């Protein structure tokens, strides 16, 4: 559990936007309570945990959740890229219709066929004054620019968009 927590922290510490911090216990509780609706998979190198991925299965979706990565090994062993392929493998195996990879690291996700989808965000405070401030602040929040890769031929893309 400590190794998982350290890997989670490596990713968390690099994140530009943080809503809250999870404990390693959270992942194990999710697995225990959600059973097959939650996946938690470890990546090992010489019996040492060097990465983990988690995700939720629901209503024909696989929602990629948090990951943890030992960045010292990521470049040489392409840990994160392997995680993306594993999400795809699990989705095919479980016959899910869509995968949500989340809103970070968009360029590498586009190499496996992911593309950005605009999301609606509803935030409301109980008091009026903070609501006005939130509206102003969130008007400035824009996705980071990235180089969108195209993993499919044009014809295949058109079929995906249907």
Where on the chain are the PLM-derived regions?
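Short, hydrophobic/aromatic alpha-helical segments in well-folded domains
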Residues: 7, 23-30, 83-88, 104-108
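A conserved beta-strand-loop-helix scaffold within acyl/acetyltransferase catalytic domains
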Residues: 1-75, 156-162
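Active-site/acyl-donor-binding loops of N-acyltransferases
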Residues: 45, 94-162
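Short, flexible segments with low predicted structural confidence
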Residues: 63, 80-81, 137
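Generic signal for short, ordered secondary-structure residues
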Residues: 6-9, 70, 87-88, 132, ...
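Conserved acetyl-CoA-binding loop-helix of GNAT-fold acetyltransferases
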Residues: 74-89, 101
């Amino acid at each position: 559990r400590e190794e998982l927590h350290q890997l989670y922290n490596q990713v968390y510490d690099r994140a530009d936007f943080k809503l809250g911090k999870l404990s390693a216990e959270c992942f194990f509780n999710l697995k225990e309570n959600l059973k097959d609706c939650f996946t938690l998979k470890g990546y090992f190198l010489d019996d040492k945990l060097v990465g983990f991925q988690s995700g939720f299965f629901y209503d024909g979706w696989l929602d990629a959740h948090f990951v943890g990565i030992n960045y010292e090994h990521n470049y040489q062993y392409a840990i994160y890229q392997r995680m993306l392929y594993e999400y795809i493998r699990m989705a095919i195996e479980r016959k899910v219709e869509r995968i949500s990879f989340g809103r970070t690291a968009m360029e590498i996700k586009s190499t496996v066929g992911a593309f950005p989808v605009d999301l609606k965000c509803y935030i409301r405070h109980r008091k009026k004054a903070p609501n006005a401030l939130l509206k102003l602040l969130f008007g400035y929040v824009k996705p980071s620019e990235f180089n969108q890769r195209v993993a499919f031929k044009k014809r295949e893309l058109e079929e995906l968009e249907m």
